[in-house]
Curated annotation (Swiss-Prot):
NCBIfam families: PRK09585.1-5. It catalyses: 1,6-anhydro-N-acetyl-beta-muramate + ATP + H2O = N-acetyl-D-muramate 6-phosphate + ADP + H(+). Keywords: ATP-binding, Carbohydrate metabolism, Kinase, Nucleotide-binding, Transferase. This is Anhydro-N-acetylmuramic acid kinase. Pathway: Amino-sugar metabolism; 1,6-anhydro-N-acetylmuramate degradation; Cell wall biogenesis; peptidoglycan recycling. Belongs to the anhydro-N-acetylmuramic acid kinase family. It comes from the Bacteria. Transmembrane segments: none annotated. SUPFAM superfamilies: Actin-like ATPase domain (SSF53067). It comes from Rhizobium etli (strain ATCC 51251 / DSM 11541 / JCM 21823 / NBRC 15573 / CFN 42). ATP binds at G13, T14, S15, M16, D17, G18, I19, D20. The keyword Lipoprotein does not apply.
Amino acid sequence: MDVVRTAIGLMSGTSMDGIDVALIRTDGRGFIERGPFLGMPYDAEFRGRLKRALELARPLRDRNERPGELREIEQELTLRHATAVTAFLERFGLAANGVDVLGFHGQTVLHRPDEGLTIQIGDGRELARRTGLSVVYDMRANDMVHGGQGAPLVPAYHAALAGKFQQAGEAVCFVNIGGISNLTYIGADGRIAAFDSGPGNTLIDQWVEMQTGRTYDPGGEIGGRGKVVPALAQRYLDSPFFRGNVRRSLDRGDFAPLRPDEASLEDGARTLAHVAAASIVKSAGFLPERPSAYIVCGGGRLNGTLMAEFSAMAEGSRVLSAEAAGFDGDAMEAEAWAYLAVRSLDGLPLTFPGTTGVAAPVSGGVLATP
């Protein structure tokens, strides 16, 4: 009988807006019992520090290198994650000795799959020491060692959630709209295909922050007042990324932000929401078949302008928020990291040829004990 474990997942994504903490009970296979979720936003000063980490990581060629200031930021990030775990346990009245493992993503500061290089800052051993819990971390590296792109990793969890659609004979596609958007297709026969689809919230967030100092477009309200600037949209959609049959994973720096004088605030936000939606649809053309439904998770599902654009382009497929499909769109990535941590403990694959391009299914992750 497969062992059911209690796991907490910790996710800090490319939007760099905070730490998501979620608990599940799972056997790392088909049994999943979802528990509580807590989002802990970063303050503006630390968000600035994480952006600085992106600059510091740019010249690195060794994934284990942490020069000076980057090491300091890593230590602070790790401490914040330890604090988040403590706050989560206290908030929901949970005992640490009832948790079997933490799944720790860390913060991606560099991802260059063509060079076989990915760097996530966050000290798993220090997190284990501070929390007194076992930690599985560094889950992307082994995939890249075996020729994969190192992303996306969440599809293994999406596949486990897709059972009710498979039972109905439906193909479904999970769309995670974070800083970068990615797709996970699960066919009625269980076939999985997954890849990054293009820019998600990153370009919108960068534009709104540049123009207003706010960190995102709440509800898509700003974009909703604007109009699409076709020439600007086409500049993004003509990217070589959308051509050719080989899908690759993306870094948030792969698409340059708009220049400040290229559009009004509203038109820029609307154009970039259009680009995010059109990127999903263009990339979905590489899926084995058109899904009957798109299940949208991640922060982008809360941008009404983006969702309206996507729904209008979806060519007959249903577009549902994660909540409408019975899931929690805020918690899903953190839940996935908890699920992957349990799979790692059991030596089960985290990635597959159809998700990262790895030659054969491989496990991954490093275990740190207190």
